[in-house]
């Protein structure tokens, strides 16, 4: 049986950061039937308002949520990307025989928030670890900035992303 390890990266990063800094992980993974999955933080090149204007919003800061603001909702659906699109590609195309594989998720910073939420909300993962997570994004500047753009004013943030 293969084991799936999803590494959810933090603010300002891309799907390449872990791969560049943790090459030993891939050697260990290949010896232990472990599949390392490195989803990106956000869509790239979507052309949404301000998505490349700041380091703490947009590209590099998708927060692994599904945006509801019409300016972002077409592209910023990172929760669905990981739990539906990416998972379907993994199971249907790359590893169709591994439907029962164990899945772990780990995240850092913004990715820690993503890991916790993906674990608690989706029920796809059997274990979760979060290192220095942005655990309460509506009460920190990075989360407030992102959520106000992805969802609108704070009273419009869906409770599924704040609880």
Residues covered by each model-derived region:
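Non-catalytic cap/lid and distal C-terminal segments of serine-dependent acyl enzymes
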Residues: 1-163
């Amino acid at each position: 049986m293969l084991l799936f390890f999803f590494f959810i990266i933090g603010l300002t990063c891309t799907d390449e950061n872990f791969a560049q800094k943790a090459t030993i992980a891939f050697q260990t993974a290949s010896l232990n039937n472990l599949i390392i999955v490195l989803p990106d933080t956000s869509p790239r090149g979507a052309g949404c308002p301000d998505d490349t204007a700041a380091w703490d919003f947009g590209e590099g800061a998708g927060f692994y949520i599904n945006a509801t603001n019409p300016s972002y909702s077409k592209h910023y659906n990172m929760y669905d990307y990981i739990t539906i699109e990416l998972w379907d590609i993994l199971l249907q195309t790359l590893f169709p025989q591994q439907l029962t594989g164990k899945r772990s998720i780990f995240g850092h910073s913004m990715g820690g928030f993503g890991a916790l939420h993906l674990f608690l909300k989706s029920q796809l993962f059997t274990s979760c670890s979060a290192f220095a997570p942005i655990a309460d994004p509506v009460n920190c500047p990075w989360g407030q900035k992102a959520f106000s753009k992805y969802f609108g004013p704070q009273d419009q943030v869906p409770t599924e992303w704040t609880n």
